[in-house]
Amino acid sequence: MKMNKLVKSSVATSMALLLLSGTANAEGKITPVSVKKVDDKVTLYKTTATADSDKFKISQILTFNFIKDKSYDKDTLVLKATGNINSGFVKPNPNDYDFSKLYWGAKYNVSISSQSNDSVNVVDYAPKNQNEEFQVQNTLGYTFGGDISISNGLSGGLNGNTAFSETINYKQESYRTTLSRNTNYKNVGWGVEAHKIMNNGWGPYGRDSFHPTYGNELFLAGRQSSAYAGQNFIAQHQMPLLSRSNFNPEFLSVLSHRQDGAKKSKITVTYQREMDLYQIRWNGFYWAGANYKNFKTRTFKSTYEIDWENHKVKLLDTKETENNK
């Protein structure tokens, strides 16, 4: 296969953009509201909502914790977003001779957006900063009067005045968590992106790594290998779990509702995966790799109505969106 033909094919493919969207045929389930009276001031109301995209293999599990505090002039909602986002991994064809490719889960995005007026705002969230740890753990605590604290670990920072607590705990080997740039008082979002990936002791490599001769060696097994192209990738089990399997997100957001505002509001929760295209080719002398970022994007959104007065939620809509280069 000639190089110019390969380059033209790659360019033509990258220039083509296909955008497909529509309402998902997703099943949603909401549990009955459970009530827990902490004391004569604070009452907790809890319900869990699930929505799935079978097509994209994305599952949202949202836990809504309403906090009614007589010593505070606002309503508080602690929303925990968990579930599953499949990587979309597609392994290479082992019979490919001098050119082969695979698709891998390079980045996962989760966001929560308040669709209401100024009566409902995002006032806190976790994680709060960039995190490159193998395991991300945070604990949120709510104390009387609307005070919120977020600490590292699964129990640190709590005291006897804590009326409610919630934790997050997820793994991100070779990936890192960053806060979305458009995070503000109406939106909060996180990205969990491939960051430092080792290849048999070499590296670390990332999505943008580049060697002037061998290109991006992210998943390249050997520069001078005599194997077929489809067999010259590192073994699948050597790839980071998030690149080839699933990501199980756990994020927290805190929404505050002014009691003299509208009794109902809307929020939209978005789960997304970005798949990169990684390919290798033999040029007659050596193997070289190339990584094309965000080659396929799959997005699943759910919109809920929040009933602040009755501490209930209602699934209004779900939407699936595909974006292919």
Swiss-Prot record:
A GO cellular component entry from the record: extracellular region
Matches recorded under Pfam families: Leukocidin
Subunit structure, as described in the record: Toxicity requires sequential binding and synergistic association of a class S and a class F component which form heterooligomeric complexes. HlgB (class F) associates with either hlgA thus forming an AB toxin or with hlgC thus forming a CB toxin. Interacts with host AMFR.
Gene name in the database record: hlgB
Top-level taxon in the UniProt lineage: Bacteria
Molecular function in Gene Ontology: toxin activity
Biological processes, Gene Ontology terms: cytolysis in another organism
Protein name: Gamma-hemolysin component B
Signal peptide as annotated in the record: 1-25
Keyword match Oxidoreductase: no
Keywords: Cytolysis, Hemolysis, Signal, Toxin, Virulence
Family: Belongs to the aerolysin family.
Gene3D superfamilies: Leukocidin/porin MspA
Described purpose of this protein according to its UniProt entry: Toxin that seems to act by forming pores in the membrane of the cell. Has a hemolytic and a leucotoxic activity. Promotes host AMFR-mediated inflammation by mediating 'Lys-27'-linked ubiquitination of TAB3, TAK1-TAB3 complex formation and phosphorylation of TAK1/MAP3K7. In turn, activates host NF-kappa-B signaling pathway.
InterPro entries in the record: Bi-component_toxin_staph, Leukocidin/Hemolysin_toxin, Leukocidin/porin_MspA_sf
SUPFAM superfamilies recorded: Leukocidin-like
